[in-house]
């Protein structure tokens, strides 16, 4: 069975832009990158993390003060890959605005709440899910024990990150993330994962004057 994400990417539309040097063709994601929009779509893994981090660093180099928009529709994925994106978001100078469309689950929810304070949004019918990290190991008993200790440390670190960005106390975060916990957009706002639920794009000053 073919990968639906790869199938979708093979059908990415091209857009034509008129410039004083003539016409130039972009795939739609490259054109949106010019507008400082980055997509996290699908499972979070090393390949995606590499591309997202590279785009964040490029946009910082292009303009270290202008906001970057991160659109998220992800079921989550590899913790270390997600942490690479998270650390890069915190490391760069431009503020990163996040918006959930569809779902932000597991590492997707952590990246959603990691946006700049006051700039974390979700669309009204999006779904957010938080839980503790999971993993499976095999091998010698001593190695399994070390892996178990490591995942417990990772769980504690993830809990601390959620505490930092939501304002909830540690016990609430630990209890909420103990099992898969699904939230509506409004519930995610009340919990502190996002700052607002938006249904319509706000008008720009130019549109208001027109």
From Swiss-Prot:
For this protein, what is the EC number? Answer: 3.4.21.92
Q: Name one GO cellular component term.
A: cytoplasm
Pfam families membership: CLP_protease (PF00574)
Active site at: 106 (nucleophile), 131
Name the keywords, alphabetized.
Cytoplasm, Hydrolase, Protease, Serine protease
Single GO molecular function: ATP-dependent peptidase activity
Tell where it localizes: Cytoplasm
InterPro entries in the record, alphabetically? Answer: ClpP, ClpP/crotonase-like_dom_sf, ClpP/TepA, ClpP_His_AS, ClpP_Ser_AS
Where is it predominantly found? cytoplasm
This protein's source sits in the domain of life called Bacteria
Name one process (GO BP) from the record: protein quality control for misfolded or incompletely synthesized proteins
Which reaction(s) are listed as its catalytic activity? Hydrolysis of proteins to small peptides in the presence of ATP and magnesium. alpha-casein is the usual test substrate. In the absence of ATP, only oligopeptides shorter than five residues are hydrolyzed (such as succinyl-Leu-Tyr-|-NHMec, and Leu-Tyr-Leu-|-Tyr-Trp, in which cleavage of the -Tyr-|-Leu- and -Tyr-|-Trp bonds also occurs)
Asked if the Swiss-Prot or TrEMBL record annotates the protein with the keyword Protease, the reply is: yes
Q: Could you tell me what this protein does?
A: Cleaves peptides in various proteins in a process that requires ATP hydrolysis. Has a chymotrypsin-like activity. Plays a major role in the degradation of misfolded proteins.
Q: Which PANTHER family match?
A: ATP-DEPENDENT CLP PROTEASE PROTEOLYTIC SUBUNIT
The record's note on quaternary structure and interaction partners says:
Fourteen ClpP subunits assemble into 2 heptameric rings which stack back to back to give a disk-like structure with a central cavity, resembling the structure of eukaryotic proteasomes.
What's the family? Belongs to the peptidase S14 family.
This chain's protein is named ATP-dependent Clp protease proteolytic subunit
Q: Which organism is it from?
A: Bartonella henselae (strain ATCC 49882 / DSM 28221 / CCUG 30454 / Houston 1) (Rochalimaea henselae)
